[in-house]
Amino acid sequence: MERVERENGCFHTFCPIASVAWLHRKIKDSFFLIVGTHTCAHFIQTALDVMVYAHSRFGFAVLEESDLVSASPTEELGKVVQQVVDEWHPKVIFVLSTCSVDILKMDLEVSCKDLSTRFGFPVLPASTSGIDRSFTQGEDAVLHALLPFVPKEAPAVEPVEEKKPRWFSFGKESEKEKAEPARNLVLIGAVTDSTIQQLQWELKQLGLPKVDVFPDGDIRKMPVINEQTVVVPLQPYLNDTLATIRRERRAKVLSTVFPIGPDGTARFLEAICLEFGLDTSRIKEKEAQAWRDLEPQLQILRGKKIMFLGDNLLELPLARFLTSCDVQVVEAGTPYIHSKDLQQELELLKERDVRIVESPDFTKQLQRMQEYKPDLVVAGLGICNPLEAMGFTTAWSIEFTFAQIHGFVNAIDLIKLFTKPLLKRQALMEHGWAEAGWLE
């Protein structure tokens, strides 16, 4: 990993509890209960204000001073859970812990076990503390909490056999042939239903009619994962979930690039086809067509210099996609790199001579920005406005988290997230805002 540098800087990232924004819509009949301080509640109300007023399936249990001296949070938490049950009637409740819970050493796991027994349905703890996790790793914590509900074996079904005598059997019944257990494919990641349907359709056209997804919208219909399962991650930040699947289920986790951009989607599909012995000849034409559809946007991006400061752990796949667009990625900063799950992405970026910085130091990045003079900086929300004031054009990294960016069909939405800020800056300059001092 000679091209990966580490600077041990602080994470400039959203809090992991914000992952409820997409998870509460993915897992039906669920409720996400966040346990934290007034500051955490204010963050959720500010960041997800539209969803809060839409009466979404998440809420807050605010820690008070009396909770600091309480022997156990079970009783107080139980009162909040009862309110949730009365109003929402969920089939599963996820209790998301925050930094405050970690600092106070509150044992929510024991409380959740007691509450699961009391209410008769799963109350699952998930560690979403921002102390050692980045924004998107909240999804990893929730999926990891769901793994015990993933079956190891499919429900037994009695086969209906039609007995027919074989030729030259002389009336003797032949011995039953033992069939090898079939391998199944499971895609892992909480992406939108339309994205899943597109990927399932692509794989069906290539010869895989059945493709399961984890998480399923219904907790009672999770796919089987065992030693016969091939697991393929859709997101680069599911490390704990994948490690547990390898260790406890003995499933094969396919190491490939992520289906982000036409190039990534093509390699993703090819890796699955090769694993299952399927023909890959049709994939190249699909990729070529996707690139042709992007040509107007590619003309805007070619030759531009783009820098990632690091926020949502999508930086490496996005940087790989941009290099395929003839963009010079001057630096790909990211909070954390799990080399085992990102092996293919790292190899491609090294081949393309992209500087990769793990846990970057923001002060040093500011100095490098002055040297690079990038055309676009991809950064977290809290950093973008100050950078704009310094004369840099920025893109919000959070937009890549919420947008549909996987697969061939969504490639146009992905590339527009990069071209839109560039076009905005160009329009401002054409209207004379640069002369007024708004832009340098």
UniProtKB/Swiss-Prot annotation:
- Which biological process, per GO, is one annotated for this protein? light-independent bacteriochlorophyll biosynthetic process
> Could you tell me which pathway this protein works in?
Porphyrin-containing compound metabolism; bacteriochlorophyll biosynthesis (light-independent)
Q: What is its EC number?
A: 1.3.7.7
Q: Does the keyword Lipid metabolism apply?
A: no
Quote the catalytic activity from the record: chlorophyllide a + oxidized 2[4Fe-4S]-[ferredoxin] + 2 ADP + 2 phosphate = protochlorophyllide a + reduced 2[4Fe-4S]-[ferredoxin] + 2 ATP + 2 H2O
Q: How is the cofactor bound?
A: Binds 1 [4Fe-4S] cluster per heterodimer. The cluster is bound at the heterodimer interface by residues from both subunits.
> Which residues bind [4Fe-4S] cluster per the record?
15, 40, 99
Keywords (alphabetical) are:
4Fe-4S, ATP-binding, Bacteriochlorophyll biosynthesis, Chlorophyll biosynthesis, Iron, Iron-sulfur, Metal-binding, Nucleotide-binding, Oxidoreductase, Photosynthesis
Describe the subunit structure: Protochlorophyllide reductase is composed of three subunits; BchL, BchN and BchB. Forms a heterotetramer of two BchB and two BchN subunits.
Q: Which PANTHER family match?
A: LIGHT-INDEPENDENT PROTOCHLOROPHYLLIDE REDUCTASE SUBUNIT N (PTHR39429:SF3)
Instruction: Summarize the protein's role.
Output: Component of the dark-operative protochlorophyllide reductase (DPOR) that uses Mg-ATP and reduced ferredoxin to reduce ring D of protochlorophyllide (Pchlide) to form chlorophyllide a (Chlide). This reaction is light-independent. The NB-protein (BchN-BchB) is the catalytic component of the complex.
What is the protein name stated in its UniProt record? Answer: Light-independent protochlorophyllide reductase subunit N
Question: Which gene codes for it?
Answer: bchN
